[in-house]
Amino acid sequence: MKAEKVMEREIETTPIEPLSPMSHMLSSPNFFIVITFGFKTRCNRSAFVDGINNTLINAPRFSSKMEINYKKKGEPVWIPVKLRVDDHIIVPDLEYSNIQNPDQFVEDYTSNIANIPMDMSKPLWEFHLLNMKTSKAESLAIVKIHHSIGDGMSLMSLLLACSRKISDPDALVSNTTATKKPADSMAWWLFVGFWFMIRVTFTTIVEFSKLMLTVCFLEDTKNPLMGNPSDGFQSWKVVHRIISFEDVKLIKDTMNMKVNDVLLGMTQAGLSRYLSSKYDGSTAEKKKILEKLRVRGAVAINLRPATKIEDLADMMAKGSKCRWGNFIGTVIFPLWVKSEKDPLEYIRRAKATMDRKKISLEAFFFYGIIKFTLKFFGGKAVEAFGKRIFGHTSLAFSNVKGPDEEISFFHHPISYIAGSALVGAQALNIHFISYVDKIVINLAVDTTTIQDPNRLCDDMVEALEIIKSATQGEIFHKTEV
């Protein structure tokens, strides 16, 4: 009781800020993002300390901790605190010469971090520096950040604002180019605007109804990917694979699609291969089983207009205001995991489904429901809503576009960027992050449900190779014609 009164007095005299609706839903100590930076040089601890002191701690969320405000129904709030950057940078004392398999060690080390709840008594981030050479990098920085601080796109933008171009060490990284509307878009709107609004309205009603059915009772079919949210225990394993961005672009250009369509199609094909291997019986029997499965993913959708890297840099350098944090919606994406003779069918199905999601307002309605629930029913109701969504679907999926040119992070040239968000009750979280000519497939799996995450990762890589070969066959056929 005394502790509560002391905390009340502290909150009354300290500038506080409430959590955003999505941050409320992601406020559990077990919800965080683990990002791995592979560097081309050895890590310099002093460079990280100086760099963070000059940038990240000036971002409000990185210099605040989460506290319970007993004046407002026990809701969590952000409270600014003084901190020592050294306390958030961890350099483990390791005998690197005795480590026989560095790649496996890093995988185990990252997974171990993923299984430790966040220390909520201090600002919710930490850096682990490993001066260990692996097959992909000379050293690594593993960053653990609580998900309430920001979503994947926000954190990527903020980290880019701390980075500089390799070609020009004093220059900020350029924003990734946004898709421009055609010059005649206004005329197009005038011509088909009425029909388009009918489509938007109808599609939104249908997709929103499916969302609410999922919240209420509609669950995925029990399958080898689906965890058991009721047991409350998850043992995380984090693995990744690096694929060629050029291979993805080849498929994208040939099929006239978006990168996200290709990645979703590849995911569907990989999941189909993996699920097929988990069922006994002949090929025909397995095909029948896969046809009956309902497998869906909660796909994160960025709702924020493009934030300029310069604005984020100014926020950290000058303390200026910049909208930043968790501003994402979620759509329920039905995954096509049936056996297909034509591997390109997985890409076509992904595009058709995503096109339907794009013209619906499902993601905005999702965010609106969270905001409404928080205002009228409180944070506990928001957490319960999130548990229903994540507990009734099989996996989470997101894709974060990284820089197109090589950059350095606190004077360390980057070789690759990997990252996984560990949220919700799903046993499988799939995330893609691009960097220059690479795309990293990141899987965070609950090993109590999925015991062979590397097999699943390999199935996704193999699926991409099969789709690429089929695409090259399409190119050859078009050339012949």
Swiss-Prot record:
Its Enzyme Commission number?
Answer: 2.3.1.20, 2.3.1.75
**What is one Pfam family matched by this protein?**
WS_DGAT_cat
Induction: what does the entry report? Up-regulated in the stem epidermis during active wax synthesis. Induced in roots during drought and salt stresses, and upon abscisic acid (ABA) treatment.
Q: Which SUPFAM superfamilies match?
A: CoA-dependent acyltransferases
Keyword list, A-Z: Acyltransferase, Cell membrane, Endoplasmic reticulum, Membrane, Stress response, Transferase, Transmembrane, Transmembrane helix
The protein's annotated pathway: Glycerolipid metabolism; triacylglycerol biosynthesis; Lipid metabolism
Q: How does it sit in the membrane?
A: Single-pass membrane protein
What does the UniProt entry say about where the protein is found?
Cell membrane; Endoplasmic reticulum membrane
Query: What tissues is it present in?
Result: Expressed in flowers, siliques, top parts of stems, and leaves. Not found in roots, seeds and young seedlings.
Q: Name one GO biological process term.
A: response to abscisic acid
Null mutant phenotype reads:
Severe reduction in wax alkyl esters. Reduced wax ester coverage on leaves and stems during normal and drought conditions leading to compromised growth and relative water content due to an increased leaf water loss, especially during drought.
Catalytic activities:
a long chain fatty alcohol + a fatty acyl-CoA = a wax ester + CoA; an acyl-CoA + a 1,2-diacyl-sn-glycerol = a triacyl-sn-glycerol + CoA
Tell me the residue ranges located in the Cytoplasmic compartment per UniProt: 1-185
Q: What does this protein do?
A: Bifunctional wax ester synthase/diacylglycerol acyltransferase. Involved in cuticular wax biosynthesis. Required to reduce leaf water loss, especially during drought.
Q: What is this protein called?
A: Wax ester synthase/diacylglycerol acyltransferase 1
